[in-house]
Structure formats: structure tokens, C-alpha cells
Amino acid sequence: MTAALALSIAPEVAQAEALRERVQVLESRPGVREVLLVTEAPKRAPSERHVVLVLGGGGGGFAVVSRDGLPEVYGGLSPDQRQRLADTVGGVVIALSPPSDRPIMDREWRLSSAHVCDMRRAVDWARAQWPCSSAWVLGINNGALSAAVATASIDDLAGAVLLSCVDEALDQPQKSERMRVLAVRHCNGAGTSPNASGGCARRTLVSVHDERRVPSALEAGNALHAPRFNGKEQQVVDVVARWILTGAAPDEIR
């Protein structure tokens, strides 16, 4: 597993031509750096823009794979998924790496104040770059716990998207009542958390029905770095984008 993106980059900002993504490096805490992969859609009116910060599963690192001889970076979402989401919401998708002092993030770390500090630094940077945009966090698998912790700790967020999340992520409170939360889970694994609805009208649950499609070798190789919805990943991305824009989502994806 690649815990961080292996690129030779300047401390402040660089352009990764081969990956066709903008790379930003931030100092999140004294002496600690984190890498951001920035995917931006064509410009729209400022009031229509959204920034989505993606927090990966597994240990939280980036996976670098080769397709047709060109490197691709899976930072929670695949490059195609990041671009599709950015284009649909008319904004920016930012994949966040683990911090340099914690290349593999476990549950204890994801609940820590230092992790919140790292996420807050990324949110603050994004808000400074796109001040008229709404900021969201999207977490995948273990990253969903990070996203939920972010909404419990960082006030300057519009809400969170939790993909393939465990009940512990759903149980996290939100810092502000205005925040919205979308949880997308497998139908056969989406147990009901006592606080899954919690009487919160701004929390939306979507079930993905599992038709037991056998994953390809490429999908299996990236299982820890991207959401696994058995061939319905594109539908999930579209549902997420629609929910960010409108607040509406279907009860299920088949």
C-alpha cells in the first residue's frame, strides 16, 4: 500500500503534469505536511460552487496505479470519479493525504484532536481559495469516520458524505444544526444505528443493493482506496452530487 503520494514537489505548490492534477502541500501543524490533490471543474458563478474534501479509507493513503502506461492516483476516489463529481457540482474536489507524521491512520488517530487540526487546515485553505463556495467532507470506509468527526468539530462545513460507513460514523454529532449528512451504505451491511436518523431531518440514508457482481482485478487492487459498490460507483457519485446541489437523494440505488 502506498501511504502517501510519491512525487518530487515543492513545499508550497506544484503541477503534476503526468497525473493532470494540481498538487498542493500544506503545513497543517508545526513541521507536519499534508498533500492535497486538487481537481477543479470549469468555472461557474461563485454562488454555485462547492468544494468537496475527500478522506480515503484504509490507512488513508494514496494509491498510484498505471493505466495505459500513465500513472493514476486513487485518493479515496478514482481520477474519473473526482473529475465527474467536480464537474457535476461545478466546483472542486480535493483528496487529502495522511499527515507526514502519521502515514497510516488508524481509528484512534481519526478520533484525535491532531487529525481534526489537519482537516481544519485543509478546510481553511480551501475556503481561502474559493471563499464563495460551500465546503463539504466526503469520507470512504474508515475515512467516513474522519468526515463525521470533522462535522462534529469544524463549524465552517456545509455537511458530510459518508460512503460505506460504520455505525460509529453515523453516531457522531454535528457541530451545527445547519449541516447536512448523507450516508450511502450497502443494503446487506447497512445495520441500523440507534442514532442513524436520530430525529435529524438533515440526515439522509441511501442503501445500495448488492447484486454480487464479481469485481475486476483493477477494482480489487484498489479496494482500500475507493468505494466498493459493485459496479454502481458512478451512480453513487451522481447521487452524491445531486444531494450536494439539491439536498434530495433516493432511498436506494439498484
Regions found by a protein language model. Give the residues of each.
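Bacterial N-terminal signal peptides
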Residues: 1-8
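N-terminal cap/lid segment of alpha/beta-hydrolase-fold proteins
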Residues: 14-47
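Short, surface-exposed "cap/lid" segments of acyl-processing enzymes
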Residues: 44-84, 88
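Alpha/beta-hydrolase active-site loop
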Residues: 77, 105-130
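Conserved alpha/beta-hydrolase
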Residues: 82-103
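Primarily recognizes the serine-hydrolase "nucleophile elbow" in alpha/beta-hydrolase
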Residues: 121-178
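The feature captures the conserved acid-bearing segment of alpha/beta-hydrolase catalytic domains
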Residues: 158-213
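C-terminal catalytic histidine-bearing segment of alpha/beta-hydrolase fold enzymes
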Residues: 202-254
